[in-house]
């Protein structure tokens, strides 16, 4: 026997095909060792009696059920043989329950037997509780739809075990509750509604739990990819706007008319180009008549505008004067109005208010200007001398001759 095993091992190491006699020998060993392995597994299974306090060597119902569910997939036998093996693991009241079930239902299956054992010995929920938990299971805020479907499936299986929902109606009930309590995209919601409408009489063709999970996950992956594609586009557009010189280009000076006298109009908008616009009006502007157009719409020749550019401005850097209407049009349909700040303009040549030296009519008569200045200085000097002659506390009657 040892030589045969050695030859089989050497042939496998050399990747050579096994001879026909080796295959027949392995099948014989499998048939002979199968019952031995099964009996060894049966000996290792714990017992369940259904008593409140388990005896030595016995398990609680939950542990026994977990053990049975673990070995059932390895039992390649008929339903009758499986029930016989399960009978060997029962004692006391649990064994009597199984005998009653077999007597009342000769065609009892393993699934029906386990369901009956859960109802008798398990801690199952009442039908009212299971019904309420399932139909009140809603998607939480921030929860993914796929996680909600998994959480909903747990409550659905509990409701099926409690007997309030038939297993054949599970697909339809799952879809209806998902549409009611889930936050789905518009496309996925329409697809699921179409399924319910088309297969209303063919519930077996509705998507089951795994198919529904796949549909929801595909929709979530598509949404995530779409959001990731959109975010770089938005950031790129913001960067382009940030580096674009057009976004920071200063606006031209804005001049408007006003009925107030001697006002300065300065544009203090956010995109200020450091240019001040001064509007100077005459002392006595004419009153508008009822038939005349509004002041802001007509040109006023008596209005004078002084535009002062900042040193940093790229345009002409010298003051200029112009007459015009009260609004500046920067483009088709674009009219803007600046804020007003009142300030009195005084001419440095003639000393009069209401105009500047650039527009002074007396600019050519400089001799008269100097003469006026000399007279003013003499008057101030004479007044100061008169005050110095009067001692503190004395009364001087200026009506008497000195």
From Swiss-Prot:
Pfam families: PNMA (PF14893). InterPro entries: PNMA, PNMA_C, Znf_CCHC_sf. Residues 308-341 are annotated as: Disordered. Keywords: Metal-binding, Transcription, Transcription regulation, Zinc, Zinc-finger. The keyword Nucleus does not apply. GO terms for molecular function: nucleic acid binding; zinc ion binding. Residues 311-322 have a biased composition (Polar residues). A zinc finger (CCHC-type) spans 345-362. One of its GO terms (cellular component) is nucleus. PANTHER family: PARANEOPLASTIC ANTIGEN, ZINC FINGER CCHC DOMAIN-CONTAINING PROTEIN 12. Interacts with SMAD1 and CREB-binding protein (CBP). Forms a protein-DNA complex through its association with SMAD1. Transcriptional coactivator in the bone morphogenetic protein (BMP)-signaling pathway. It positively modulates BMP signaling by interacting with SMAD1 and associating with CBP in the transcription complex. It contributes to the BMP-induced enhancement of cholinergic-neuron-specific gene expression. Belongs to the ZCCHC12 family. This is Zinc finger CCHC domain-containing protein 12. The gene is ZCCHC12.
